[in-house]
Structure formats: C-alpha cells, structure tokens
Amino acid sequence: MKNSMNVSEIASIIREKVETFDNPIKRENIGEVISVTDGIALVYGLEKAKFGEKVFFASGVEGIVLDLDHNTAGIVVLGNDRDVKEGDVVKCSGDVVQVPVGHELLGRVVNALGHPMDDGGEIRAKNRMDIESKAPGIIDRKSVHEPLQTGIKIIDLLIPIGRGQRELIIGDRQIGKTTIALDTIINQKKVNDEVNENQKVYCVYVAIGQKISTVAKVVNKLKESGALEYTTVVVASASDCAPMQFLAPYAGCTIGEFFRDNGMHCLIIYDDLSKHAVAYRQMSLLLRRPPGREAYPGDIFYVHSRLLERAAKMSDKKGQGSLTALPIVETQAGDVSAYVPTNVISITDGQIFLESELFYKGFRPAVNIGLSVSRVGSAAQLKSVKKVAGSIKLSLAQYRELEDFAKFGSDLDASVQLSLNKGKYLVELLKQKQHLPMSIEEQVVLMYIFSNLYNQLSKIQISNVNKFEHDLVNYFRTVHPGVLKKLSNDMNGDIKGDIFNIVSNFVTQFNCV
C-alpha cells in the first residue's frame, strides 16, 4: 500500500520549510560610472556614500569619494584611470583609506597606500590605521622641551628644534632644502645608538611629486649611512596621479603617529608641500570647485593645517611620545609672500629660510639667520648650548650689516675692524659639508672657542679654519672624549679650563705643522 499524504501534511511541511529558510539579503551601495577625466570619475548612484569613503571599481582599482552631489559622486581614482570605463559598476567599502603601520615598515619604501615599492617582499604589519585622523587636543599635548638634534651647526645653535615641533624649511629650488632634511635623519643614528628603545627617533620621509631618480638617490644615501633601518620612505612620484600625491603626506603622517601614540618619537619630512598643493589644486579644479587666489581652492589652508597639526608632543598620560614635522616648501625667486608659503609659515612653529645668494657665495647650508626663526625650540636647548649660542646670532647679524658697510671702502675704526674679522671666522665655523652631521657637544666646543678664545682662534689663517675645525674635532673625539661627554649636560668652570688648555696646546701644534 502506497503512503499517501493529505493536503494538511503537505501544507505543514511547506510552512516549516518557509519558516526555517535562512538566506539573508545582502544590500550593497553601488553606482555606475558616467564619465572619467584625468583621474576623476563621475558616478551615478552611491546614495549612501560618505565623504572620504573608499570605493572599488569593477577593475579592482580603488578610489575615494571627494565630492557629493544630489544624484552623483565625484571620485578620485587611486591608480591608472585607463582601467576605469564608462558603465563600470562602483561599490562602496564602508571604510576610509587605511595604511599598514608599525615597526614592520622600517627600512621599507612604500607608496601612498602602503604597498611595497622595493624588493623586500610583502609587508605583514600587525596594525592598520586610517590615514585621516583628528589631531591631538589641548589636554593631550605637552609643551616642547626635548631637543631634536639635526647635526647641523647653524640650526642646532641658532634655530633649535624640539621634539614635537613643526619647523618649515623654505627656499628656492636646488639650494639644499632636502639635504638639511636628510642630514637630520642621518644624525639620528648617533642618537639612536646611545639610547633605549623608547628614546629612539624613528623617521618617515615623504617624497611628493619628485623624479623617481631623485628618490632613488635619497634611498641609496640613507642605506649608505645606515639610516634606512629606522626610516620609512613614502613615495608618490611625479609619474603618479594627483590623488596619490595628495594622499602621500597623510599616509606618512599616519605611519609616524603609530610611534607617537605608543610613547616613542618620530621625525617626518614632507618633501615638498608645494607639489602637494599643486596636486590638490588639480583635483579640485577637475571636481569643478571654485578657484581662489593663484587658482588654489579655498580650503587649501585647511588641507595643510589638518596635516601639520597632527605633529605634537604628547602629555604624560598619553605616553610622552612625539611627532616632529619638517615640511619643505619651494619658493620662486625667494618670494615668501606667495599663497602656499605664507599659509605654511603661519601654521608652523618657525621656519628655516635658505637663500640663493648665500648658497652661490659658498656659505652652505645657505641659512638666512635674519629671516629664520624657531618659536618654541629654545625651550628644548641644552644648558651648555644656551651659554655659548646666546651671542652668536647677534654677532652674525652685525657682521652681515658691517660687511655691506665695508664695501663702500671708507676707513674703519679698530672696533669695527675687529667685528668684521670675528665675523669672517664665525662664517667659516658655521659652514658645513653635506651628510657630515656633528654632535651637539662638538658644536659647543667650537662656539665656545669663538666666543671666549678668539685670541687663540685668530692665530689660525682664515683659509685654514675648516681644516683646523676638522682636526680639532677629531682630536677631541680620540684624545678627550670625556670632556665632550661632560658637555652633554652643562658647562662649568672646570670644563672651560680643560677646553682652554686643550685648545691652546692644539693651536700651537697646528701652527707648527
């Protein structure tokens, strides 16, 4: 006899299957590409898209929502826009752009999205962070009080930089801006070799809109100096699209913030923000935003201020970490009154102004002391530095003024002639070859000799001052390292006596050679 099921049983089985059926509906926020022009895609749809949200095109290329209209969204393409075609489907990710962070990135060269550009293989970072984050608040900060040594005499003595400061490097092209930044990174090797893990200074170098050959030279120099092991290089070269150049400094800042927020110290170089502003101007004009002065959009100040405000010295409760920023801005014919230079000057805590005229006269680094200033760095200077550097800036300024006066050829009295002669020795002592940073203790010795032992120094011919300096520093390093070590704290009468005796004997020996 065949089993037969009545209608009620069949109905109950169907009802049970329907009630237990579980196939959740997945909703996706999608849109369709209407047009693509110069790295900007206009997309119809994406009703739930958020400003700054990351999206994916059908080809796998990423993009960021930077413009929201009634029915359309303007998306900057993070890659080759040839891979994006009209009619392609675009999907929202629900997230903003993130980059890998941590010690795993040290010694690596990455692009603005954190993807490796060297031959070091995949980066397996344990942490990722949003590239856009809020700057630390007032309560979370602490005043700058720890020095960041650059190894460059004229900067450490006259324009001191502290950890957590933002110091602008500004000047015309090809007069040593990048060299100052690189020497600062290289000098941290001496510091890092002598301190514990939490006191080390890690570095991030962000190359924006530069030639790939130039970036390769920078990376090779860092390798040769042993500085790449504590440095991450973020590259958005001239051949990269404008959105990648725009993102690069934010990505680099995020990498630096990892160290800052974990009680460590980081130095970040933005090379340079002029090209960053040009990239943002290009994007804004393509997004049809109204142009302002020099065709820059109205929010260009905010673009740089929200980046540079993330550099800070953190409070005790927040771990006492720091992020020090050295942005670089290129001027045209020394014009610091242009839009981007004035903006960045007003945001930062001081500026190091490089002058073409000084550079071509042979005074390198070509720092114009009259226009350069550090508004907070003096609080971070060592006591020994303050004692010898106080009168140096005034002496140099007086020499520059008297130098112009002496050109008229009039008779000069003895005091003016003495000031001129002292100024010539000071200028020679402040000159420094690139990629040869000097410890702060050695700088103190040289400036103490100028300020207090000029009678000894004047026995050396002007043409031999650089050789005298080189030999004297080596003499202190090899024969009297204990004296240099004492200078790392303060300078008392005993140390002054030791320096006087050492220098007097050395001058006699030097002149006899």
Swiss-Prot record:
Catalytic reactions on record: ATP + H2O + 4 H(+)(in) = ADP + phosphate + 5 H(+)(out)
A GO-annotated cellular component: proton-transporting ATP synthase complex
EC number from the UniProt entry: 7.1.2.2
Pfam family, one: ATP-synt_ab_N
Superkingdom of the organism of origin: Bacteria
KW Membrane (keyword) present: yes
UniProt cross-references to SUPFAM superfamilies, sorted A to Z: C-terminal domain of alpha and beta subunits of F1 ATP synthase (SSF47917), N-terminal domain of alpha and beta subunits of F1 ATP synthase (SSF50615), P-loop containing nucleoside triphosphate hydrolases (SSF52540)
Binding site for ATP: 171-178
Cellular localisation: Cell membrane
Membrane topology: Peripheral membrane protein
Site note Required for activity, residues: 372
Gene Ontology terms for molecular function: ADP binding; ATP binding; proton-transporting ATP synthase activity, rotational mechanism
UniProt keyword annotation of tRNA processing present: no
Keyword line: ATP synthesis, ATP-binding, Cell membrane, CF(1), Hydrogen ion transport, Ion transport, Membrane, Nucleotide-binding, Translocase, Transport
Transmembrane segments: none
Family recorded in the similarity comment: Belongs to the ATPase alpha/beta chains family.
Subunit (UniProt): F-type ATPases have 2 components, CF(1) - the catalytic core - and CF(0) - the membrane proton channel. CF(1) has five subunits: alpha(3), beta(3), gamma(1), delta(1), epsilon(1). CF(0) has three main subunits: a(1), b(2) and c(9-12). The alpha and beta chains form an alternating ring which encloses part of the gamma chain. CF(1) is attached to CF(0) by a central stalk formed by the gamma and epsilon chains, while a peripheral stalk is formed by the delta and b chains.
PANTHER family listed in its UniProt record: ATP SYNTHASE SUBUNIT ALPHA, MITOCHONDRIAL
Function as written in the Swiss-Prot or TrEMBL entry: Produces ATP from ADP in the presence of a proton gradient across the membrane. The alpha chain is a regulatory subunit.
Name recorded for this polypeptide: ATP synthase subunit alpha
Organism from which the protein derives: Wolbachia pipientis wMel
Lineage summary: Bacteria, Pseudomonadati, Pseudomonadota, Alphaproteobacteria, Rickettsiales
